[in-house]
Amino acid sequence: MICRVGLAAALALVAVGGAAGPASSAAPIGSGVYTVRVDPRLCPSPLCGGYWVAFANGARTTCADGRRRPRCYVAKAVDEERHPLEVAVPDLGLARADLESWDFEGVGRLGVLAVTVVFTPAGSAPVSGGYYRVVDTGVRCVRTPCFSFRVTQVNGSTRTTTSGVDLRASGALAGEIARAQAALHTKNGLIAQGRFARTPDGGRLFRATRLYLRAPQPRA
């Protein structure tokens, strides 16, 4: 329910397409990882100026209206409590999130991205390959190749191991690579986009073309 403090406030809310909130009560979110593009269109909000999102590694995404499309428009991004994010999700970034359908006064129902984690892209190399979560398992071998990295497809169950990870291939800055290396040793690992290659010693290398670094998630 929207609380109106006065006629002027109500009119202002309608003018900007005030959102009444999700159709159901706030529930745990973050079931998938989505690619995010900032909407560059200049028509009035909330019909423009939000984000275009797609299910990472998916050919089509189920949008807020239930239809499956290559990508979906969302009017805005909110946090787990459905408060507006204080800072925008970066263009070409990733978000662990869910798509919800909200009612916007005077407009109708539009998609909203409910976000738990934002990932900022890092790197300047041409992007290719799928999205993967990479974890250093801590296994150390006497002989090479040593398949010590676990690589899992984002939004999927396909899993493999590699004997090496090339982060520098992404063209990221030294500080960004250092953060990515630290993420490899965490429980959640590092999300990266890239491809696999064989090595001369019989090993397998994951060559990252883009790194995604976990960002703070401030809210208003």
Mark where each language-model region is:
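Bacterial N-terminal signal peptides
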Residues: 6-17
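C-terminal region of N-terminal signal peptides and the immediate post-cleavage residues
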Residues: 16-28
